[in-house]
Amino acid sequence: MKTSIASHLLEKVRAENPLVHNITNQVVTNFTANGLLALGASPVMANAKEEVAEMAQLADALVLNIGTLTKETVESMILAGQSANKKGIPVLLDPVGVGATTFRLKAAKQLLEQVNITVVRGNAAEIAHLLEVDGWESKGVDAKAANGDVSALVKQAAKTLQTVVVITGEVDVVSDGEDVLSIHNGHEWLTKVTGTGCLLTSVIGAFCAAGERPLHASAAALLFYGVAAEKAAQYTQNKGPGTFQMELLNALSHTTGNDVLTLGKIGRNVT
């Protein structure tokens, strides 16, 4: 995949202004909504089971995030997901901290069984826990350093889950079970602000709504987000994570298709 595809998709997202329905966690709701607005998409944050199926029918993409789960939230996610499947829009799953508790793992597997998921995005530990693969550690909802083969893991996950899988980290990787693409953009400051991964999943949702193959749409979103993070870090300089959060929102608005074309770094991995 070339960076020109990502550049084109960014412009298409901004032209079409897709409505992204988020059933997400309490910690990141505001940041996610503002990030989608900065990108050029439209967010809606509806989680009441009385309306989620109807809301999903209005949306162009649906994002399910298990960061602050309740039994009622899981019910809403299933209703919204099945409604989105009927409409034929992309559904994304962010299995935040899925290895932390039995409840989270059970909920994530329930969603994968009852909803046709287009893209799963998580860190390496989260994806490994979904597959019940040993050797990848987590701390609460965060990943710890590991020495495993992330490219092999993402390809295995995509095959097993029969969906596109994105693993984010120092290098981001995405696979559809056949190809593995790696994105070499981003900045360490992304790990210092809560919600940057959750927002990324919603950004991927906006790109998937643009109609490209989920593999390419996911890679394009990763390129855009990584370039925006690098630009935000330049403006942050020696300041703190609060400044970076603000500058990331600014960069999501100001990063152009030409920025992605010239600054994006993508490779194709052989596993």
Swiss-Prot record:
It comes from Bacillus pumilus (strain SAFR-032). GO terms for molecular function: ATP binding; hydroxyethylthiazole kinase activity; hydroxymethylpyrimidine kinase activity; magnesium ion binding; phosphomethylpyrimidine kinase activity. Signal peptide: none annotated. Belongs to the Thz kinase family. It comes from the Bacteria. Pfam families: HK. It catalyses: 5-(2-hydroxyethyl)-4-methylthiazole + ATP = 4-methyl-5-(2-phosphooxyethyl)-thiazole + ADP + H(+). GO terms for cellular component: cytosol. HAMAP family: Thz_kinase. One of its GO terms (biological process) is thiamine diphosphate biosynthetic process. Substrate binds at M45, G195. Its cofactor is Mg(2+). This is Hydroxyethylthiazole kinase. Its EC number is 2.7.1.50. The keyword Transcription does not apply. Pathway: Cofactor biosynthesis; thiamine diphosphate biosynthesis; 4-methyl-5-(2-phosphoethyl)-thiazole from 5-(2-hydroxyethyl)-4-methylthiazole: step 1/1. Keywords: ATP-binding, Kinase, Magnesium, Metal-binding, Nucleotide-binding, Thiamine biosynthesis, Transferase. ATP binds at R121, T168. Catalyzes the phosphorylation of the hydroxyl group of 4-methyl-5-beta-hydroxyethylthiazole (THZ).
